[in-house]
């Protein structure tokens, strides 16, 4: 029943009614539709008004005490979940190193393939995906350059691939929020914006570097202007907190990977079984060790076995192979990772509500007053770089941002500069770590770190300095809208971006540059043409011939995901792959704007 005022007057429509009318008009196609709106009736990119916290008023000392205790326990649970989440990422990285380190070493040994820039880029991506550590991938490159197995020019595309491969971690983390459509839409768009930025930067800088060697020359100029002195290792705050727990599970000797490439030894185990000798201080600590140097005794030590000290971790002295231990750690770390993510999201939704959530969102997403609003994004870049430098891990930082985006604490426009700052922060950490490397590797380590730094800096100049060129943001929103409507698109994106397309490019590069250009050139041109036509169809359809103003003349499966969605739903009838019936039913409530307005009067 509509409410009425005295004298039979009808109250004016509320802002909520106008908002619903506006959304219904958009869903009807008057001003462009958004998949998220079509399905759920709410715009996931515009966070809904928060409930007033006045409803939480308590009476009595017992109720207040109960609320204080509950808040304290939630805070402890949140910190504990975050701690084990970070530890699970560390163990996940160790698992991938155990599973893929030998394969990564075999890939890097083929110097003929590495001389191809496209092949070098793909190898950098695949190796970083395999070992889940940009530091390990960079250390391999530095060792090969120092051993004269690679030139600096050949290593540049590999470093670009390493930068791209690091974004897979945040994408995997976003998959844990696929249960809620809106949360998954925001979280996946946040992970996608990082990968899109890296790929767009590669598409511009890889041809430029192949033609001019700009990054290599710039790093040489920087080295010539600097007087290098061996320095101390970068601060290791995060590892100091997580190492006591993770070292009880597994300890690895990462130098086995690089030594296997440079000295052709492939029979050493990556698992560290011995941590020193009797009567000496165990060398399990990393103090005084550089990023590219080994501070542990090798398993193949010639000392008598009775004089060695067995390491204290779960797999010390185990007869299991590296592959078996890797699979065990992979399953366990993924399980803990998913459980911790679910707990973090639930606790954040419970803690961040009412005025608290409003204050947090306002502070994080706020801009400086006019005319200094443009400085807010650059401050976010500095914050992202500083936090990544302190954490010593860009993967951990980006993986922590993604759940916050899912629950609506950080919006995409603010997360984008944070991710860019994280890219800069991880290169400064590598630069300081390179200064602590041995003297014979110092120059090469610093030059590789500088190339990595200039690559990310050039990406910021390309895709952030000019607001109209911040293309990763709208592209990520489109991916988020697609994944909200068809959740299986996220899996397709993951497989195509980090596995299938790199493998296809790698296979073509093996056939030679002529075959790569003959096959890859037309395909890339076709993709760019389709993108251009789609943009013109939306903004300037009159510029196109009548036949290209719409794709309706093509078969449905070539211009719509509906047939593919029916196929995927038939093969995988689970909730994560299809839309719920309730969601589709709610969408029909916004088809008639007049009905909505009358219901609000």
From Swiss-Prot:
The chain crosses the membrane at residues 76-96, 111-131, 188-208, 325-345, 370-390, 442-462, 488-508, 513-533. It is a multi-pass membrane protein. Optimum pH is 7.5. The modification Phosphoserine is found at residue 4. Pfam families: Na_Pi_cotrans (PF02690). One of its GO terms (molecular function) is sodium:phosphate symporter activity. Involved in actively transporting phosphate into cells via Na(+) cotransport in the renal brush border membrane. The cotransport has a Na(+):Pi stoichiometry of 2:1 and is electroneutral. This is Sodium-dependent phosphate transport protein 2C. It comes from Mus musculus.
């Amino acid at each position: 029943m509509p409410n009425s005022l005295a004298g039979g007057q009808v109250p004016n429509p509320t802002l909520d009614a106008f908002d619903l009318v506006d959304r219904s008009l958009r869903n009807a196609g008057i001003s462009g539709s958004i998949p998220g709106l079509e399905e759920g009736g709410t715009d996931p990119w515009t966070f809904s008004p928060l409930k007033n916290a006045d409803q939480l008023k308590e009476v009595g000392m017992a109720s207040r005490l109960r609320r204080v205790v509950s808040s304290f326990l939630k805070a402890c649970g949140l910190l504990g979940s975050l701690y084990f989440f970070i530890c699970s990422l560390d163990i996940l990285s160790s698992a991938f190193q155990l599973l893929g380190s030998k394969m990564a070493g075999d890939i890097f040994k083929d110097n003929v393939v590495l001389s191809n820039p496209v092949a070098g880029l793909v190898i950098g991506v695949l190796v970083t995906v395999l070992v889940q550590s940009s530091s390990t991938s960079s250390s391999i490159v530095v060792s090969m350059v120092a051993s004269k197995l690679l030139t600096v020019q050949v290593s540049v595309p590999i470093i670009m691939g390493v930068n791209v491969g690091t974004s897979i971690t945040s994408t995997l983390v976003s998959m844990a929020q696929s249960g809620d459509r809106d949360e998954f839409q925001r979280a996946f768009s946040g992970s996608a914006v990082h990968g899109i930025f890296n790929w767009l930067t590669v598409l511009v800088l890889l041809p430029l570097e192949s033609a001019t060697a700009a990054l290599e020359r710039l790093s040489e100029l920087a080295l010539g202007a600097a007087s290098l002195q061996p320095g101390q290792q970068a601060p290791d705050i995060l590892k100091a907190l997580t190492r006591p727990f993770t070292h009880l599970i597994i300890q690895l000797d990462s130098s086995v990977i690089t030594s296997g490439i440079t000295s052709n030894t492939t029979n050493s185990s990556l698992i560290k079984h011995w941590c020193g000798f009797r009567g000496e201080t165990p060398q399990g600590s990393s103090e005084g060790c550089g990023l590219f140097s080994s501070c542990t005794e090798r398993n193949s030590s010639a000392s008598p076995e009775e004089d060695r000290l067995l390491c204290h971790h779960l797999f010390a002295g185990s007869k299991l192979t590296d592959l078996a231990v890797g699979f065990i750690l992979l399953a366990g770390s993924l399980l803990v990772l998913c459980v911790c993510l679910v707990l973090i999201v639930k606790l954040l939704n419970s803690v961040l509500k009412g005025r608290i959530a409003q204050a947090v969102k306002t502070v994080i997403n706020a801009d400086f007053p006019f005319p200094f609003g443009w400085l807010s994004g650059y401050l976010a870049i500095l914050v992202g770089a500083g936090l990544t430098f302190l954490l010593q891990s860009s993967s951990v930082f980006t993986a922590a941002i993604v759940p916050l985006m899912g629950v609506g604490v950080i919006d995409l426009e603010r997360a984008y500069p944070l991710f860019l700052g994280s890219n800069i922060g991880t290169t400064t950490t590598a630069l300081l770590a390179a200064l602590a490397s041995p003297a014979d590797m110092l120059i090469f380590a610093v030059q590789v770190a500088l190339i990595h730094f200039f690559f990310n800096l050039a990406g910021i100049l390309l895709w952030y300095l000019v607001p109209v060129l911040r293309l990763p943001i709208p592209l990520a929103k489109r991916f988020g809208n697609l994944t909200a409507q068809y959740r299986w698109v996220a899996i397709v994106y993951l497989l195509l971006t980090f596995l299938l397309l790199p493998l296809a490019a790698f296979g073509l590069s093996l056939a030679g540059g002529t075959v790569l250009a003959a096959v890859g050139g037309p395909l890339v041109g076709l993709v760019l043409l389709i993108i251009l036509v789609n943009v013109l169809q939306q903004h300037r359809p009159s510029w196109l011939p009548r036949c290209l103003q719409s794709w309706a003349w093509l078969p449905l499966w070539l211009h719509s995901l509906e047939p593919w969605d029916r196929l995927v739903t038939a093969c995988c009838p689970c909730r994560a792959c299809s839309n719920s019936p309730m969601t589709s039913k709610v969408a029909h409530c916004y088809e008639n704007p007049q009905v909505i307005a009358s219901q609000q009067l």
